[in-house]
Amino acid sequence: MADQTKKRYVTSEDLKKHNKPGDLWISIQGKVYDVSDWVKSHPGGEAAILNLAGQDVTDAFIAYHPGTAWHHLEKLHNGYHVRDHHVSDVSRDYRRLAAEFSKRGLFDKKGHVTLYTLTCVGVMLAAVLYGVLACTSIWAHLISAVLLGLLWIQSAYVGHDSGHYTVTSTKPCNKLIQLLSGNCLTGISIAWWKWTHNAHHIACNSLDHDPDLQHIPIFAVSTKFFNSMTSRFYGRKLTFDPLARFLISYQHWTFYPVMCVGRINLFIQTFLLLFSKRHVPDRALNIAGILVFWTWFPLLVSFLPNWQERFIFVFVSFAVTAIQHVQFCLNHFAADVYTGPPNGNDWFEKQTAGTLDISCRSFMDWFFGGLQFQLEHHLFPRLPRCHLRTVSPVVKELCKKHNLPYRSLSWWEANVWTIRTLKNAAIQARDATNPVLKNLLWEAVNTHG
């Protein structure tokens, strides 16, 4: 009883006032935590917390943190509790499900997917080296380019997995795998991926908070981008100018060609982040890993006999990775979108609304890297991909219970939905009555502040 009298209370409205850098509070299970100073040390990045600032973040916290993380909360507790703390039926069921998965050990039983994938990556790399260095046939070189593209896809899946949970027994080894599979093998910084990907997960399909939807002037999934909205992630305006209008007017035609060279933009984004003034965890290690890639890859290409074959080799290897770039878009482009920050109180609902699953046979799971179960992954990002197919029926049943969407489309259907979404926006972009701003070519590479 004495402890009860010492409690101090705030309302949810009071909590919302502490939602900016320097004055940043969050609540978890009714207890309030002041993370104003600590937010810069957050392993998942500042953006993830800033997106949910001044709110209850219990569901997101459960989704992204292991049980050991709860022990670190008490030192951030400022003594306040939320007086009108309320848990919805959806959240209550979600938390029960997460607890059940934890009790069954699903978050800890990682299987051997990473080992198998890295073994395949090693075999493909050996085949690529042999094809380029020991063969003179152009067909051998083309096959090597295809294998290199597939290698990059599978390596990216390992980087993705290791970024969400520890795929090995130790954190240092996990970090090494991140750098090898991301920076060294693919040339894409794991630091950049974590920065954008964590924000994407938290603010799934928010037009102004989710960086994975912000592709002006190349693509726009919603006509709301035509108002030149401000990206809360990049901290700059996404200008809808004459260049954007022209490109977006034909985006349903240019989608697949752009995906074939989309890797170039990821290289640019990596360099822009690593050499920016932003705080980048392990910046030196990330730069070192990128230097490894830009040493072996150009060197490998240089062993090809002429510039024509070199160009074809690079283009084919990049084009193969378009399969993965397209998949990322299929999971979200045709799903529901919204503007504004995510709401911690309907976190589960926002994840179901903003994602699409891709249906496939179990023998194709390796090809999609588990991301065909996009909703399951978004709800339980720490869940090893070997369990996603197992939990899928349970998630589907929970969505059905609460009348929430659970959309699982074939690869063909998902492409049709995506192209339809792009076409609808393209037709609207051609409307001359929509005002545009002055052209800024530099917007084409999503520059960072």
Swiss-Prot record:
GO terms for biological process: cellular response to cold; sphingolipid biosynthetic process. GO terms for cellular component: endoplasmic reticulum; endoplasmic reticulum membrane. This is Delta(8)-fatty-acid desaturase 2. It is a multi-pass membrane protein. It comes from Arabidopsis thaliana. Disruption phenotype: No visible phenotype under normal growth conditions, but mutant plants show enhanced sensitivity to prolonged low-temperature exposure. Keywords: Electron transport, Endoplasmic reticulum, Heme, Iron, Lipid metabolism, Membrane, Metal-binding, Oxidoreductase, Sphingolipid metabolism, Transmembrane, Transmembrane helix, Transport. The gene is SLD2. Highly expressed in flowers and siliques. Expressed at low levels in roots, leaves and stems.
